[in-house]
UniProtKB/Swiss-Prot annotation:
PROSITE patterns: IG_LIKE. Keywords: Adaptive immunity, Cell membrane, Disulfide bond, Glycoprotein, Immunity, Immunoglobulin domain, Membrane, Receptor, T cell receptor, Transmembrane, Transmembrane helix. It comes from Homo sapiens (Human). Residues 130-144 are annotated as: Connecting peptide. The connecting peptide (CP) domain is essential for signal transmission in response to antigenic stimulation, likely downstream from ZAP70 recruitment. This is T cell receptor beta constant 1. GO terms for cellular component: alpha-beta T cell receptor complex; membrane; plasma membrane. Pfam families: C1-set. The chain crosses the membrane at residues 150-170. InterPro entries: Ig-like_dom (IPR007110), Ig-like_dom_sf (IPR036179), Ig-like_fold (IPR013783), Ig_C1-set (IPR003597), Immune_Resp_Modulators (IPR050380). The keyword Transmembrane applies.
């Protein structure tokens, strides 16, 4: 029944900071949901080229509501890359889902609409690592504090020196 044909909605979820900091890896997750029938092909594209390395896709779509005969389906896939590759803002990641509204065995005529075939995708760009962690922040604050104290000490020493020179000049004037 063509009235029950629903194309997928596709979303890409970015890797967690915890995963990146603990494993030096980044896993992007693609989720295709709400489609019926379950005829889809999912692929990952990085910088305009299809990739297979680091990809793990569910073996088949799952029913969102298994109790219903005409339940819509969902499918997930993961792409794992190095943390440094993910942290390059020039890298472009795209999850593409090709959806076939009818199977190859279904026939269609002029009285029946052509098979629904769509490409639905979602994307993400690499995120630059701003370099701030709690440790680097604390080190930066400590360095700034030490630098401030050095500059303050230097300014105080300069003020004492100038005051001493002014005082000596005033004493010499009184002697004349």
């Amino acid at each position: 029944d063509l009235n029950k044909v629903f194309p997928p909605e596709v979303a890409v979820f970015e890797p967690s900071e915890a995963e990146i900091s603990h494993t030096q890896k980044a896993t992007l997750v693609c989720l295709a949901t709400g489609f019926f029938p379950d005829h889809v092909e999912l692929s990952w594209w990085v910088n305009g080229k299809e990739v297979h390395s680091g990809v793990s896709t569910d073996p088949q779509p799952l029913k969102e509501q298994p109790a219903l005969n005409d339940s819509r389906y969902c499918l997930s896939s993961r792409l794992r890359v190095s943390a440094t590759f993910w942290q390059n803002p020039r890298n472009h990641f795209r999850c593409q889902v090709q959806f076939y509204g009818l199977s190859e065995n279904d026939e269609w005529t002029q009285d029946r609409a052509k098979p629904v075939t769509q490409i639905v995708s979602a994307e993400a760009w690499g995120r630059a690592d701003c370099g701030f962690t709690s440790v680097s922040y604390q080190q930066g604050v400590l360095s700034a504090t030490i630098l401030y104290e050095i500059l303050l000490g230097k300014a105080t020493l300069y003020a004492v020196l100038v005051s001493a020179l002014v005082l000596m000049a005033m004493v010499k004037r009184k002697d004349f």
